Regions:
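Short hydrophobic beta-strand element within catalytic cores of glycosyltransferases
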Residues: 257-260, 270
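Conserved donor-binding/catalytic core segment of Leloir-type glycosyltransferases
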Residues: 115, 151-179, 190
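Aromatic "clamp/platform" in nucleotide-sugar-dependent glycosyltransferases that forms part
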Residues: 240
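Nucleotide-activated donor-binding/catalytic signature segment of Leloir-type glycosyltransferases, i.e.
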Residues: 202-220
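Carbohydrate-associated surface elements
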Residues: 120, 141
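Conserved acidic donor-binding segment of nucleotide-sugar-dependent glycosyltransferases
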Residues: 272-273, 277-284, 293-298
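Membrane-proximal helix-turn-helix segments that form the acceptor-binding/catalytic region
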Residues: 94-114
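Short alpha-helical donor nucleotide-sugar binding micro-motif in glycosyltransferases
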Residues: 219-220, 227-232
């Protein structure tokens, strides 16, 4: 598209402070923890005079409050806002800091445009006081050439999978409880991902006496991930809130149905009864019932999987790029939002 893109982000030990990746000029400052506190100073010292047309801020956990910077027209890119869910994962002081940092968004960003990755995130912004007309919803894409179906490798016996971080707020405990409640003969649950909540989840599987049918795979590589998505009869997702269910779309592109909580963000990545099923968040019995239903109807797994694959093809990175470019051009042309 002929654009010049500069990325300012956090670094990690031994990471070079500057790099050019796929034509993008990358500036790394601080670490994941310190970046929010160092970004402003770095910007004003090294980038503020670079004559950018637009500054896009990824508003994630701790806002940078770029409207207080010396900067061009701005767009706030919002995956999702934590709100009260921060208290489910973080210690009270840290959760309170995240919650408080999000509170002044409508005031401080009152002249800025926003790009939300889901309608749920847009609605969250509106509830907090951001005008609806200042928000453009642009869904992320999925590489459907990378994630592809292969029904020939589907597990012969019911196999369910969870893929994602093992964090308390992700609701993986609900997935294990539902699997235990379903009590499907010969069924297995494979959990892929890492996190400090793993030991507690392993204890839960022992308490529920399903530890011999629940496998914790840890962090897996991409090829193993693709194989798991293809083998599973359904993936399970029970988070109370997400910006977007990217794992659900990866499963869909792989021809695998999804059983997920009817939660903000997640509900937009599953078409209930078409590509999988949505159940009330926290309703273990409802999730277990859907698992039982699929286990008794293998042909339904393939039917939902085929529809899921078709659904996933609607979400391309080309479309996301074109919509984002159009939005940024519009904001630059009108000089932001007033």
């Amino acid at each position: 598209m002929g654009h010049h893109v500069t990325l300012l982000c956090g670094g990690w030990p031994d990471a070079p402070p500057r790099a050019v990746l796929d034509g993008i000029e990358v500036h790394r400052v601080g670490t994941r923890a310190t970046f929010p506190f160092l970004a402003r100073r770095y910007w004003h010292r090294h980038l503020a005079d670079a004559n950018f047309d637009v500054l896009v801020e990824d508003i994630n956990k701790v806002p940078l409050f770029t409207p207080t910077w010396r900067s061009p027209v701005r767009v706030g890119l919002v995956p999702h806002l934590f709100g009260g869910t921060a208290f489910q994962e973080l210690a009270a002081p840290l959760a309170a800091a995240v919650w408080l940092a999000e509170r002044p968004l409508p005031l401080i960003y009152r002249h800025d445009a926003f790009e939300a990755i889901s309608e749920s995130t847009r609605d969250d912004l509106v509830r907090r006081g951001v005008a609806h007309e200042r928000i453009r919803v642009i869904f992320p894409g999925i590489d459907t050439d990378h994630y592809t179906p292969d029904a020939s490798v589907r597990s012969r016996t019911p196999l369910f999978a969870y893929l994602g971080r093992l964090k308390k707020y992700k609701g993986v405990d609900l997935v294990i409880r539902a699997f235990a409640a379903a009590n499907i003969p010969g069924a297995e649950l494979e959990i892929a991902g890492a996190g400090e909540y793993r030991s507690e989840l392993e204890r839960l599987s022992r308490t529920l006496e399903v530890h011999d049918r629940v496998r914790f795979l840890g962090r897996i590589d991409e090829s193993t991930k693709i194989a798991l998505l293809r083998r599973a009869w359904a993936t399970l997702f029970a988070s109370p809130k997400e910006g977007w269910g990217i794992t659900n779309l990866e499963a869909a592109a792989s021809g695998t149905p999804v059983i997920a909580s009817n939660s903000p963000g997640i509900r937009e990545s599953v078409r209930h009864g078409v590509t999988g099923y949505l159940v009330p968040h926290g309703d273990v019995a409802a999730m277990a019932e859907r698992m039982q239903h699929l286990s008794n109807a293998h042909e339904l797994v393939e039917q939902l999987g085929a529809a899921a694959r078709e659904f996933a093809t609607e979400f391309t990175w080309q479309r996301a790029a074109e919509e984002t470019e159009a939005h940024l051009r519009e904001v630059v042309t009108i000089g932001g939002v007033r």
